Every structure is written in structure tokens, then in C-alpha cells.
């Protein structure tokens, strides 16, 4: 049985409303102090929180630095790319 317009719209809205993660990946180029400053500037994180995420990136190879709506996550990734950080968006 085909989906009604309401059912289709509801499924589409559900798909975009799922939380999305902004993931920063380790790279061999950027200094740890630089990555910390970028997290503070882009996300408004405290020194301590920014350093925690930076350490995750450095030690684990990645860190989920933000979770929320997809559109905002994609905007954050673009900002991070502007600072030459490796960042991606993934479903939470």
C-alpha cells in the first residue's frame, strides 16, 4: 500500500530530526594548541572542554565535538574545514 503524503512527510522529518554528530579526525599537520583554540572559537568551549576534545582527537583519532540538527552540524563542519581541520558529519 503506498504511503500517504502525511506519512511520507513524517518519515522525512524524522530522518532530518535525528541527532547528527560533528566528528573531528586526527591529522599530522595541526598543532594540539591550534586545535584547542579552534574548538574554543567555533563552539565557544572552555579551555578545559576544548583540551578534552583535542586529547580525544590526538589519542583516539577522532572526537565527537558536537551533536544536534543536521543543518547546524554541516555548518560547523564547513567552519572547521575553514580552519583546515578534518571534520565530518555522521548520524548519532
List each language-model region with its residue ranges.
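Terminal domain-initiation and capping elements
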Residues: 1-92
